[in-house]
Regions:
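Long, contiguous interaction/targeting segments characteristic
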Residues: 1-11
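Exposed beta-strand face motif in extracellular beta-rich ectodomains
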Residues: 92-96
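Aromatic-rich carbohydrate-binding modules that target alpha-glucans
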Residues: 48-90, 101-116
Length: 116
């Protein structure tokens, strides 16, 4: 794991701040989200705490009960947690949850996470 301040993330200071400000093991930056712009998702939740070998960010857009354009993104393990930087592809609600290599899911108690 090494020095958590080192790595390929040019915003290591921002990852540290996100780590401190996390809510239920998840932080998103920047907010509000803007379609076409990049967003960073930091995950330190249940799957990370249980030692997942790999975590995926499961993303979809639209109403909470009808996700569209659903995609899984492999996250990168850092000293601050699992991180993924991606472009917000849609103007609809940004919905997401997480799963690991053993098909365990963290969906925020069935509510998922979302930003409008």
């Amino acid at each position: 794991m090494g020095d958590r301040r080192r790595g390929r993330w040019p915003t290591e200071g921002r990852l540290e701040q996100m780590h401190r400000e996390r809510y239920a093991g998840v932080a998103v930056d920047p907010v509000p989200l803007t379609a076409g712009e990049e967003v960073t998702v930091l995950y330190q939740g249940l799957l990370a705490e249980k030692g997942a070998e790999q975590v995926w960010l499961h993303v979809g857009y639209g109403p909470a009960d009808r996700w569209e354009n659903v995609t899984d993104y492999a996250m990168e393990k850092t000293g601050w947690g699992w991180v993924k930087k991606l472009r917000v592809e849609d103007t609809g609600r940004f919905n997401f949850c997480f799963h690991d290599n053993a098909n365990n899911w963290d969906n925020n108690g069935g509510l998922n996470w979302s930003y409008e």
